[in-house]
Design a protein with these regions (language model features):
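Generic alpha-helical secondary structure signal
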Residues: 7-11, 31-35, 74, 113-117
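Adenosine-phosphate binding glycine-rich loop
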Residues: 67-130
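Rossmann-like adenosine-cofactor binding region
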Residues: 20-88
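Polar/charged alpha-helical tracts
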Residues: 11-18, 57, 81-82, 117, ...
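Extended hydrophobic/Leu-rich segments
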Residues: 1, 24-26, 123
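NAD(P)-binding Rossmann-fold cofactor-contacting core
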Residues: 1-21
Length: 130
């Protein structure tokens, strides 16, 4: 596993990696080049979209899970898609969180189709003038 982080925090995570038996290679965004992600099974971005905007073109060379949902799509997601890679975007993560929360709060199955349709409508219309 390679972790590309905004700052070098390897010392913080070394004990956990050892405990889990995971070998982690570390890099910062400044070190990251396309060679780091080419051939990766998946690239996961868990930071605000603005944190990777400067590096989106270099990093958008692998299948992507990007949990950011504002802006939609992120520059990283647009770069990955433009390079022909599948993307799973933050609104999908948001929807699944909402399904789970609905079920936990109400004790009833979430109306997933209706919730998904409402989310898609909101995403499609959010940047249009009212």
């Amino acid at each position: 596993m390679t972790v590309v982080n905004r700052s070098d925090r390897r010392a913080e995570f070394a004990p956990l990696a050892r405990e889990l038996g995971i070998e982690i290679a570390w890099a910062t965004y400044g070190d990251a080049g396309t060679e780091l992600v080419h051939g990766s099974d998946v690239l996961m971005s868990t930071v605000p979209a603005s944190a990777v905007n400067l590096y989106a073109e270099k990093l958008g060379h692998a299948p992507l899970v990007d949990v950011a949902y504002d802006p939609f799509p992120t520059r990283l997601a647009a770069a990955a898609a433009a390079n022909g890679y599948p993307t799973a975007l933050g609104h999908v993560v948001l929807a699944h969180q909402a399904y789970s929360q609905f079920e936990q709060f109400t004790g009833h199955p979430a109306p997933r189709k209706e919730m998904w349709d409402a989310l898609v409508r909101a995403v499609e219309t959010r940047d249009r003038p009212q």
